[in-house]
Regions:
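A short, basic N-terminal segment
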Residues: 1-18, 167, 178-184
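Pre-Walker A (pre-P-loop) alpha-helix and adjacent loop at the N terminus of AAA/AAA+ ATPase modules
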Residues: 6-41
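Short glycine-rich substrate-engagement loop in P-loop NTPases that contacts/grips substrate
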Residues: 14-24, 60-101
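Conserved alpha-helical scaffold flanking the Walker A/P-loop in AAA+ ATPase domains
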Residues: 29-33, 80-105, 120-129, 155
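Walker A/P-loop nucleotide-binding motif
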Residues: 35-55
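Generic beta-sheet signal
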Residues: 39-43, 105-107, 137
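Loop/turn-to-beta-strand initiation segments
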Residues: 67-68, 101-105, 133-139
Length: 184
């Protein structure tokens, strides 16, 4: 289970710990103050640095406060949106409504889905719709902002760079560190 309590700062280099401590504290504050004006967040950085862990902790805290939260991987999100659009699958159409309307949406691993013109358009539509309706989104990605612009579009880049609070995760892969220590 991913929580704020088991987010271990010891895996970050001493130079990075104060910054990561602030990221955790800001994330806890985000949960406490979650509401109509909450900002969207963009967690960027290499794999294994805690982006998913921290976004799951935020999602759980916001859900426990009674808000509707959806947590979905980018590949699953795109598969479901495509099913709803092209096969008119009822469950996928309902999924789309929830994704566009939930109080907080967390998209994990943006950039790992098969990127096509369709997925580029869907990412833009989803990001734009949620911004226009004041619905916050947290996006985790291994891509940097320039890679996002190249992969999706300048319109997606502009919205993420200009309207999301970007948080860059740095350090050594925590999963690999844990494996070296004998954790699974």
């Amino acid at each position: 289970e991913c929580s704020f309590e088991n987010f271990e700062l010891r895996y970050y280099d001493e130079r990075l710990r104060p910054t990561m401590r602030k990221v955790v504290e800001s994330s806890q504050r985000y949960v406490r103050e979650f509401g109509g004006q909450s900002q969207s967040l963009l967690f960027t950085g290499a794999p294994g640095l805690g982006k998913t862990h921290l976004s799951l902790a935020i999602a759980e805290g916001v859900a426990k406060a009674g808000h509707l939260v959806m947590y979905v991987s980018a590949p699953h999100l795109m598969d479901q949106l495509e099913l709803g659009k092209f096969q008119k699958d009822d469950a996928a159409l309902e999924f789309r409504e929830v994704i566009f309307g939930c109080d907080l949406l967390v998209i994990d691993d943006l950039g790992t889905e098969l990127v096509t013109r369709y997925t580029q358009a869907e990412v833009y539509d989803l990001v734009n719709h949620r911004l226009n309706t004041g619905k916050p989104t947290i996006i985790n990605t291994n891509l940097g902002l320039q890679e996002i612009e190249r992969t999706y579009s300048s319109r997606v880049y502009s919205r993420l760079a200009g309207m999301y609070a970007a948080v860059q995760f740095k350090g050594r892969d925590i999963r690999l560190q844990k494996k070296q220590e004998g954790y699974r």
